[in-house]
Design a protein with these regions (language model features):
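Extended soluble regions of mature proteins
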Residues: 21-272
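Bacterial N-terminal signal peptides that target proteins for export
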Residues: 1-9
């Protein structure tokens, strides 16, 4: 009987001695329904301590391989340098969303007369600015914006326009100071490098204070000629939040032996 007891005691002492940060642990769900009624959901679990953050994809019906179950994002500097880690393949890769979307923007800019996508100057209205009750146990402030603009797609000079109305609700909190939260809980999308589209991303609605604990975006696009419209909906919500969690320091380390992969051209390397 002594051996099991001593083994349990040794394990307990090991756990107690392992370095840990006083940090934040949360769970979040993002649900998307497109104009055709197709839906997807991504559930994540996050650990944050100051500028350090780990965001693991727990469940996903999104077809992107980056969000497959078990894959996670890792940073030590609030997302300035971000890694996508794949435990199944034992690989890690620099995750630079701005660079990826910038490549898309370059393609949009380079299509010239073949394909041109234009966005009119957006009109932004603040339609709500009030107490938002509590979300995941945190006091929240609710703001709502209505943004209207026109998109025009031209192929070889022939164009079609749509009038777009985007209504976006934010429930934000300023009670959480940890910068690592911004890796996942962010209101402002990354830039694409396309001037017209990026103008939409710098509107007043993204100049909110604190971190969003819940966001709901409903976008309706209407063809002015036919009158037909389509609507998409996106909802992100933090469902659980512990602000005094013990977060193991090892949570923010890439495991030894993982090899570097490439999402975009980068220098080769590995962690032995």
């Amino acid at each position: 009987m002594k051996k099991p007891v001593s083994s349990i005691l040794a394990a307990a002492l090991f756990v107690a001695a392992a370095p840990a940060f006083a940090g934040i642990h949360y769970k979040s769900s993002t649900k998307t329904e497109d104009a055709r009624g197709h839906s997807s959901e991504v559930q994540v679990e996050g650990w944050v301590a100051g500028e350090k953050a780990k965001v693991e994809f727990k469940e996903s019906t999104n077809p992107s391989p980056a969000t497959q179950k078990g894959t996670y994002l890792l940073t030590k500097d609030a997302g300035k340098t971000l890694y996508l880690v794949n435990p199944e393949e034992k690989t890690y890769a620099v995750w630079d969303l701005n660079a990826m979307l910038g490549a898309v923007g370059s393609i949009m800019n380079g299509m010239g007369p073949v394909l041109r996508i234009q966005f009119s100057e957006p009109k932004v209205e603040k339609v709500a600015d009030e107490d938002g009750g509590t979300v995941a146990g945190q006091p929240a402030h609710h703001t709502k914006y209505r943004t209207t603009y026109t998109t025009t797609v031209k192929v070889f000079g022939m164009g079609r326009s749509n009038d777009v109305v985007s209504e976006q609700d934010f429930w934000t909190t300023t009670r959480l100071p940890d910068a690592g939260l911004g890796v996942w809980l962010r209101a402002q999308p990354p830039r694409t490098g396309n001037a017209d589209f990026d103008r939409l991303l710098t509107t007043e609605r993204y100049k909110i204070q604190g971190y969003p604990l819940k966001m709901v975006t409903v976008t309706t696009s209407t063809d002015p000629k036919s009158g037909k419209s389509s609507t998409s909906r996106n909802t992100m919500e933090v469902t659980q939040l512990d602000t005094s969690a013990a977060v193991p320091a090892a949570s923010f380390e890439i495991p030894a032996g993982y090899k570097e992969a490439q999402l975009l051209p980068t220098k080769e390397g590995s962690r032995d």
